Amino acid sequence: MPTTNTGAIRDVNIVGAEADAGQQIVRKWMAHLLDANFGNGTPAWYRFGRDLSEYNVDMNPDTELRKNILGNTSFVHSGYEPSGENDTFYAHQGDPLFEALQDIVDGLKTGDACKTSALEVHAWDEQASQTEGTNSNIFTATKQDCYVVPTSYGGGTDGYQIPFQVNYVGDKVKGT
């Protein structure tokens, strides 16, 4: 037999447009980087953005709604399969990421030959420097393994391109 909920909603704290939430975060303050050395030696961090007007990490959540014979619905969230598309990567001579991508294309490499690390830096979240007298900036960041997979190569008269997918795997490790 259905029941009626007669409870009142009280003491609601509304946040959002009217709240004093601080300065809007500028897009360039969320930095996306790849290790262009693909785990071979010291990381060579390449920052996305030179030829991109937009980059998003699609979270691809694994969710399901289940309804039982009593008419109740449950929600199951099993995780994420994050990925991103860098669909306008123009090749620049001497660029270590271009050289790594061209190597993958030339060798039709797969699997761990395409594995590297991704770094996301929250440049709006500057931390106090631990070392006095230095001018270094310290920001919150996360590092995660990923696979970089070229989706095509070629392009038009505007330049040689190697667009690619980034498939993030494993857990993010938070640090500064």
Describe every region a protein language model picked out.
Residues K28, K67, K109, K115, ...:
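Context-gated lysine
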Residues R50, H122-K174:
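Short beta-strand and beta-hairpin "edge-sheet" elements
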